[in-house]
């Protein structure tokens, strides 16, 4: 379980999170949605311990984040940021194996190979990470996070992803979310991601959190949260919300 109580954070006089309280029990994919500047990435950084709020508290497994050592926290949660640039010429395989850093044991070649296959990175193994496309880098970063959290097995782990599909083609978007569902169901992973694609959230998330101007304005199942009234008010766009005939999830369509 991860929880946030009364999170407040301001920067240059602007409230980026405004008295945010949330509890995620785990065993699900959570999508945080909202317009640009809503506070989504700021909230994610607070939930992961990378950003200390001005007031309020985050807990992981009922223990305050500031009471975890850096190493122990890294064994229980991993974070993909929006940008993961590197200045030095590491190969893809070397970048992925960096996920082993919190663990005392060395590189596990079989484990790394398995995860590279899961993330469709085998053909990239010997390439310079800096020369990859944005989508290829996102796949490599996901593999690095999985190496970081893969053991001990099984045990509850949290995976935080900030716009993980921003550079992925449609095939790899589908592949990513099918993999995340598999990890949730088979390996006790819990997933929290910031997304802009409403239909991906509607199709794959178990829970959706809507944010606006630093506040959480809705939190629940996609079919309860992603309504035409709520989304029109939140985004100011002309949309229609239909029902996907395949799985009855919301289907958001832009009006002409």
UniProtKB/Swiss-Prot annotation:
Q: Which residues form the ABC transporter domain?
A: 2-238
Q: Has keyword Zinc? A: no
Binding locations of ATP = 34-41
Q: Name one GO cellular component term.
A: plasma membrane
Molecular function (GO) terms for this protein are: ATP binding; ATP hydrolysis activity
Q: Which UniProt keywords apply?
A: ATP-binding, Cell inner membrane, Cell membrane, Membrane, Nucleotide-binding, Translocase, Transport
Q: What Pfam family is a match, any one?
A: ABC_tran
Q: Which PROSITE patterns match?
A: ABC_TRANSPORTER_1, ABC_TRANSPORTER_2, HMUV
Hydrolase among keywords: no
Classify the protein's membrane topology as the record does.
Answer: Peripheral membrane protein
Q: Which domain of life is it from?
A: Bacteria
Q: Where in the cell is it found?
A: Cell inner membrane
What family is reported? Belongs to the ABC transporter superfamily. Heme (hemin) importer (TC 3.A.1.14.5) family.
Q: How does it assemble?
A: The complex is composed of two ATP-binding proteins (HmuV), two transmembrane proteins (HmuU) and a solute-binding protein (HmuT).
Provide the function of this protein.
Part of the ABC transporter complex HmuTUV involved in hemin import. Responsible for energy coupling to the transport system.
Q: What is the protein named? A: Hemin import ATP-binding protein HmuV
Q: Which species?
A: Escherichia coli O6:H1 (strain CFT073 / ATCC 700928 / UPEC)
User: What are the top taxonomic ranks of the organism?
Assistant: Bacteria, Pseudomonadati, Pseudomonadota, Gammaproteobacteria, Enterobacterales
